[in-house]
Amino acid sequence: MLFRSTSTKIQLASSNEELKQLKCQLDYVLNLTSRQESKEALASTQNLVALEGWIEQEQIEDLKMGLAQQFGGAVLLQIHEMAAADRQRVPIKLKNNALIEPFELVTEMYSLPKYEDKDPTPVVSVFYFIFFGMMAADIGYGLLLFGGTTWALKTLHVKPSLAKNLRFFRILGIGVALWGVIYGSFFGFKLPFALINTSTDVITILIISVVIGFVTVMTGLFLSGKKNIRMKDYAAAYNSGFAWMLILIGLALLAAGRLFPDLAMVGFIGEWLATVNAVGIVLVSIISAKSLKGLGPALFNLYNISSYVGDLVSFTRLMALGLAGASIGSAFNLIVSLFPPFARFSIGIVLFLALHGINMFLSFLSGYVHGARLIFVEFFGKFYDGGGKAFKPLKPAEKYVRYKK
C-alpha cells in the first residue's frame, strides 16, 4: 500500500512536469505564429527588410542597444518625432502610478483618450472609489473583497490582465469597508459607532448623494472648459463649461437662500450669478456666430438645464443601492435569528453564509455596473469623447510563461 502511494506520487510529479513542458512548447508555437504574422507586414526584398512602427520614448535606448548587439552595423535605425499629421493614428498607452493604474480598466472599458486628450483615469479613480464603496457599504463585505483579492494575488499565478482586475477590486474593497464604517454595518449587523444611521438618516444620505453628484458634474464641466481652452475654442469653453458651472452654483445658492431665510443674501447672489451667466451664454453665442443665428443654439443650450437636473437625480442611486444592500443584509440576519438555538448554529450558519454571499455578489455587481454608468454618462458625457487606439507592441506570447526583463 505504501509502495502504491509512492508510485502514484511519482506519476503525478512526472505528469505535472510534462504539463509544464507542454505549456512552454505551446507558448513557443504561439511566438512563432506571432513572429510569422509580423513578418507578413514587413516590406522586404532578398537583401533588405524595412519595418516601421511606434515605440515608447523611454524604450528607444534599449532598442538601439538591442539592435546594435544583434546586427551591429547591418541595421539603420531612424527615430522621428511624432508629426502633427500622425496625431489621429498614434496609438495610446496609459501610464499611471500603482494606485491609479488598476482604474485604467474603467477608462479602457469606455474608450482610450486620443493623443491630444488628457488621461481622465486619475479623476475617475477618486469618483469610482467613492461610488462603489457607497453602493456596497459593509465592513465585512469590504474585508472579504480585500482579503480574497490579496490572497489570489499572493498565491495564484494569474495573467497580467487578471492581476490588474484583482488589484482593482482590492482597492475597491477598502472603499466598501470605509463606507461600512460610516454606516456602521458589519454583515448587516448595526454597530454602535455608526456615523450615519441607514435607518433614520435617509435624508442625510440622500443629500450626501446629491452633493457627490454635484461635485462630479462640476468637475466634468471644469474639465470641459479646460479642454476647450487647450484647443483654443474659448466660446465653447465658456458656453459648455464654465458658464454652466456658475449657473449651477448660482442655482444651488438660490435654493439654499430659499430653504434657509437667514441665507437670503446668499440666495440673492446665487440668483444674479445664474442669471448673468445665462445671459452670457446667449451673448457669447451671438458674438461667436457674428449674427443672430447664434440665438437658436444658445436657447437650446439653456434648455439643457433639465439634463443637469436629471444628472443630479441619477446620483440618488448611491443612496438607494447602499440602503437596499444594508436592509437586505439586516433582513437575512433577522431570518436566521428566528431559528431555534440548535438550528441557528447548524443550518442557520450555512443559510447565513449563503444569503450573505448572494447579497454581497449582488452589491458588488450593482456597484460595478452603476458606478461605471455614472462615470460614462454623468461624468464623461461632459467632456470626454475617447476614440484612441490601443498601443499593441511586438512582444512574446505569455499565455503560460512569464518573461522578466
PLM features: residue spans?
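Coiled-coil termination/hinge junctions
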Residues: 8-63
